């Protein structure tokens, strides 16, 4: 709820300042994640068993003539693929050159298509033409092939712009899968179908799906006991690893007294760690994950300072100081909270420098320049609000493209990723490639649509929805409908940039895709789960960071 807070500040010679404030609900987690209480001895035993099982799987399963499609799919869905990257790559290469044109099994054809395309292999969508009738429609006989429909539905989300056959496949499968759920709730696949209709695999956060699929796989009579044991143990071991990380970050948050020093800002440290966990969960990215979580936490405070608390004069001073990035600027900042913020920002980046090797510092400098850029964008938006100015959509996007923070966060996500990120990577990023622009605009639109209900409760910065309504003279409903259409197109453009050969290594692109998946979870269905933590987000955090899997 918006209100005006009047402050008497000794730092401002007892001036009375009227400032907009927004009431954000406090953290729903309290100190739950502050302490890490897990037996290290028990964890070591589990890790040793995981390593044993990995070797067994490599020797007995991956080296056999097992059903390759099913094996790859299970490894990925169970969250185990990061242990078998080279083995899966070899299997996919074999699948890509094999002769499968005579296969008329809808499930297998769709699965092969999805597995290859999501890994960047070139595979034509024309393979689905054989499932159409003489009128050009998908055959009615396919309606009874439920597993085939579900497989085709998942494959259709890997479409490129202009692939009408996959658009038709999505419409066809969605219609009939919804009917199956509505009319056959006891169907063996009904739970999987409901989950897929809610969030298809292409948009699903990998660890969340692993948690869901392990229970599905266990009920499958044909499941491999070794794979199931490995999946459960590995999930629990990773959960312990992540909880330990989170406790470190929570102590950092607590020791800096962010909640006390910036009471006007959202206290969402757990949600932010979950956000970054969706970007990369693997143990080898621990350094990158912790660094990025701290940066996104600082960014959230910055966003709330510019959007919901600071006066235009204060923000102008802060913006200029950030551009100089010099601790000597701190004395010129008034009131006290600005000095506190500025000191924390500069000291945090100094801490990051100490964690990096000398030859890695150029990555942090690049990320720092992106932080300066986002601050300039925040100030421009604050100026619009202060002047009551509603820009045209194209003018708005020149600023809000930056202010959504996406490019800065992607750049920062690369800082701690060790040698795979090079000068060439950052040069690629600086040229704003299609996958970056598509994912950034997708993020911008979903954020604006999702946070619209809350923003309307206060005097807020103009959104892309507002600008679209003004520029095209349409209703709010029509504007949102059009922006959602663009979101669909952006997903297709993201898919296109995974086609091999890629300009940058695959893990670089995966970070962008994973950021987009998290955005989909936080803002889908026109809701802002970050500002107002809802049931869906809480349950997701419970699943990954609280509830272990019974062995």
UniProtKB/Swiss-Prot annotation:
Catalytic activity, as annotated: (2E,6E)-farnesyl diphosphate = (+)-valencene + diphosphate; (2E)-geranyl diphosphate = (4S)-limonene + diphosphate; (2E)-geranyl diphosphate = beta-myrcene + diphosphate; (2E,6E)-farnesyl diphosphate + H2O = gamma-eudesmol + diphosphate
Single GO BP term: diterpenoid biosynthetic process
Mitochondrion listed as a keyword: no
Details of cofactor binding: Binds 3 Mg(2+) or Mn(2+) ions per subunit.
Keywords: Lyase, Magnesium, Metal-binding
PANTHER family membership: (-)-GERMACRENE D SYNTHASE, OS04G0344100 PROTEIN-RELATED
Motif annotated as DDXXD motif, chain positions: 303-307
Binding-site list for Mg(2+) 3: 447, 451, 455
Pathway: Secondary metabolite biosynthesis; terpenoid biosynthesis
Positions annotated to bind Mg(2+) 2: 303, 307
Coiled-coil annotated residue ranges, if any: none
EC number: 4.2.3.73, 4.2.3.16, 4.2.3.-, 4.2.3.15
UniProt function note: Involved in sesquiterpene olefins biosynthesis, constituants of cannabinoids and terpenoids-rich resins. Catalyzes mainly the conversion of (2E)-farnesyl diphosphate to gamma-eudesmol and valencene. Can also use (2E)-geranyl diphosphate as substrate with low efficiency, producing minor amounts of myrcene and limonene.
UniProt binding sites for (2E,6E)-farnesyl diphosphate: 266, 303, 307, 444, 447
Domain observations: The Asp-Asp-Xaa-Xaa-Asp/Glu (DDXXD/E) motif is important for the catalytic activity, presumably through binding to Mg(2+).
Molecular function per GO: magnesium ion binding; terpene synthase activity
InterPro entries in the cross-refs: Isoprenoid_synthase_dom_sf, Terpene_cyclase-like_1_C, Terpene_cyclase_plant_C1, Terpene_synth_N, Terpene_synth_N_sf, Terpene_synthase-like, Terpene_synthase_metal-bd, Terpenoid_cyclase/PrenylTrfase
A Pfam family it matches: Terpene_synth
Source organism superkingdom: Eukaryota
Name assigned to this protein: Valencene synthase TPS8FN
